[in-house]
Amino acid sequence: MSKVGNNSGDSKNTLYCSFCGKSQHEVRKLIAGPTVFICDECVELCMDIIREENKTSMVKSREGVPTPQEILKVLDDYVIGQPYAKRVLSVAVHNHYKRLAHAGKNNDVELAKSNILLIGPTGCGKTLLAQTLARIIDVPFTMADATTLTEAGYVGEDVENIILKLLQSADYNVERAQRGIVYIDEIDKISRKSDNPSITRDVSGEGVQQALLKIMEGTVASVPPQGGRKHPQQEFLQVDTANILFICGGAFAGLDKIISDRGRKTSIGFGATVASPEDRRTGDIFRQVEPEDLLKFGLIPEFVGRLPVLATLEDLDEPALIQILTEPKNALVKQYQRLFEMENVDLTFHENALSAIAKRAIERKTGARGLRSIMEAILLDTMFELPALEGVREVVISEEVVTGSARPLYIYSEQKEKKGNVSA
């Protein structure tokens, strides 16, 4: 039932949302039903919940294995661009669980596991792809940072901690954990530090690669129950990693130079045309990667062999960055518009302003990751001044504001009323 205030004559007829308790003055719209009321904010929340449930149920197909098309469709809702990488991930995840669904039915051919390596410049969506997969695939999922890993016995995390995190995400259900997905980020940071053997042991580089080999290929890892340190007296949980899918991702800074150098050597001679690395985008160069380039970068041959599926991601171009700014559910423009709504102010971006923001991100070579810092710099003064100003109803951001040659345009309530009267 809706609540009716009894404190004063003004509040006697005030209506309240039956779900969140907000009054009709705190929301834009209050919809009346038989003896109940619901506000526009609660309606939006209900619609979001229904949409999420529809997306989750959509990826359920025959035998419980989502088809590649179904996985791709959900990835497209959250991740802009990268069609090739999304297709590779969709097929790999589908095949992985199809293999598990048919395990033991026909033993004449044993299907090997295909772990995945994602290579792409910074800010192109590698981590977001993995996080989105976690949201749409109903299996335990964990993310690990390769920079924190060291060999067992040294200060830092050992590789078995990854399996422990996966087990925790499965609520210590070993059967479910053994069908999970592990994403290891910053995998390029564990490359061999140099070609020359050193007196000091490389515990965070080649040593970690060696330690990861076993769990990626398939081994029975001993994990302490409910976390904590290992003690000789305690019983361990045995987790078989043979059916855990490993996805590794990294920016591989400098790999483009290795690939370009190899291209130059193979293009020597009269009439050979070699494009300068400066004339080609990093994503285009990465597409020509070969296993030998990864070996030169510092990955050991056995480790490269454990990652047979290779997907390269492209640099995000201007249209893709504009889409990222405006289209996803949690798009940056929508986030800042919601912030300004809290001050009862509309925030408007001209199309050429969004284009200028995207161009600046491309110049900085930070990809989508750099968009937030650019937006913060543009709106800093406005967000500082706005709470103390009265009567502002709209803030307009033009291309000149992004380039720094003008200030944001403030439109006051009187001006808005005049505009409305003129158009009427």
UniProtKB/Swiss-Prot annotation:
CDD domains: RecA-like_ClpX. GO terms for molecular function: ATP binding; ATP hydrolysis activity; ATP-dependent protein folding chaperone; protein dimerization activity; unfolded protein binding; zinc ion binding. Zn(2+) binds at C17, C20, C39, C42. The keyword Cell inner membrane does not apply. Keywords: ATP-binding, Chaperone, Metal-binding, Nucleotide-binding, Zinc. Pfam families: AAA_2, ClpB_D2-small, zf-C4_ClpX. SMART domains: AAA (SM00382), ClpB_D2-small (SM01086), zf-C4_ClpX (SM00994). The keyword Cytoplasm does not apply. GO terms for biological process: cell division; proteolysis involved in protein catabolic process. Residues 5-58 form the ClpX-type ZB domain. InterPro entries: AAA+_ATPase (IPR003593), ATP-dep_Clp_protease_ClpX (IPR050052), ATPase_AAA_core (IPR003959), Clp_ATPase_C (IPR019489), Clp_protease_ATP-bd_su_ClpX (IPR004487), ClpX_bact (IPR046425), P-loop_NTPase (IPR027417), Znf_CppX_C4 (IPR010603). ATP binds at P121, T122, G123, C124, G125, K126, T127, L128. GO terms for cellular component: HslUV protease complex. Component of the ClpX-ClpP complex. Forms a hexameric ring that, in the presence of ATP, binds to fourteen ClpP subunits assembled into a disk-like structure with a central cavity, resembling the structure of eukaryotic proteasomes. ATP-dependent specificity component of the Clp protease. It directs the protease to specific substrates. Can perform chaperone functions in the absence of ClpP. Belongs to the ClpX chaperone family. This is ATP-dependent Clp protease ATP-binding subunit ClpX. It comes from Mesorhizobium japonicum (strain LMG 29417 / CECT 9101 / MAFF 303099).
